[in-house]
């Protein structure tokens, strides 16, 4: 009986991690054909924002320059000029097709993310008692660690997320969020966020150390300061 009670929260933890993802993935596959059909039959006009329009124009200009360079190498003839126009036409259609696919992926990502968040929220509310048990296990585990181990864990977390080598990780995380939400990444915005977010989190973390850890466990703070120095 005790083993069963201990197994239930672990099963709940595994299900809360994988079940929302599995359901949203299944819904994504079910909606994919419907969204594709709706987009291809119901959309008579392609709507682009400034970033998407700029990206598409840059790709088109690059393609046009490459095709023009290829034709410059050959002899100019009426046949080659016709082939040049046909090549631009085909590649333009391909670029528009890719843009359509990106728009459909944006709709699917947005829909499945809403479904995933709704399932996760509902599952968390319904399993509140199991979350309390998991929280007590985590607190007990941390309580049994030595002060040195706790200080090392704090150092590992801060170095991983806020260290001098963390900007590539922040950039990857921000790009992943952009892709999941289905928004086209803006390089300037990403650069600004990579510069600002670590500073904000580092300031909040240091305030937490000064405000709470000083009174809760001065020994951990002392060990942490000694290691960082």
Swiss-Prot record:
Belongs to the CemA family. It comes from Solanum tuberosum (Potato). It catalyses: K(+)(in) + H(+)(out) = K(+)(out) + H(+)(in). Keywords: Antiport, Chloroplast, Hydrogen ion transport, Ion transport, Membrane, Plastid, Plastid inner membrane, Potassium, Potassium transport, Transmembrane, Transmembrane helix, Transport. The lineage of its organism: Eukaryota, Viridiplantae, Streptophyta, Embryophyta, Tracheophyta. The gene is cemA. The chain crosses the membrane at residues 7-27, 107-127. Pfam families: CemA. It is a multi-pass membrane protein. Coiled coil: none annotated. This is Potassium/proton antiporter CemA. It comes from the Eukaryota.
């Amino acid at each position: 009986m005790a083993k069963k009670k201990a197994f239930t929260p672990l099963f709940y933890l595994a299900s809360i991690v994988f079940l929302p993802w599995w359901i949203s993935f299944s819904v994504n596959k079910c909606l994919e054909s419907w969204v594709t059909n709706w987009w291809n039959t119901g959309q008579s006009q392609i709507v682009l924002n400034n970033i998407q329009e700029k990206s598409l124009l840059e790709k088109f200009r690059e393609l046009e320059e490459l095709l023009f360079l290829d034709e410059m190498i050959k002899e100019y003839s009426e046949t080659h000029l016709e082939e040049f126009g046909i090549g631009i036409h085909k590649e333009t259609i391909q670029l528009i097709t890719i843009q359509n696919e990106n728009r459909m992926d944006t709709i699917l990502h947005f829909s499945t993310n809403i479904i995933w968040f709704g399932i996760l929220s509902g599952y968390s509310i319904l399993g509140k008692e199991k979350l309390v048990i998991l929280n007590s296990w985590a607190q007990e585990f941390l309580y049994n660690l030595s002060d040195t181990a706790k200080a090392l864990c704090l150092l590992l977390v801060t170095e991983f997320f806020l260290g001098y080598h963390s900007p590539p990780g922040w950039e990857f995380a921000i790009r992943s969020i952009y892709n999941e939400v289905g928004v086209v990444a803006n390089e300037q915005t990403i650069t600004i966020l990579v510069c600002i977010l670590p500073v904000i989190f580092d300031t909040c973390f240091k305030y937490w150390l000064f405000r709470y850890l000083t009174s809760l466990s001065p020994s951990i703070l002392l060990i942490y300061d000694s290691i960082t120095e």
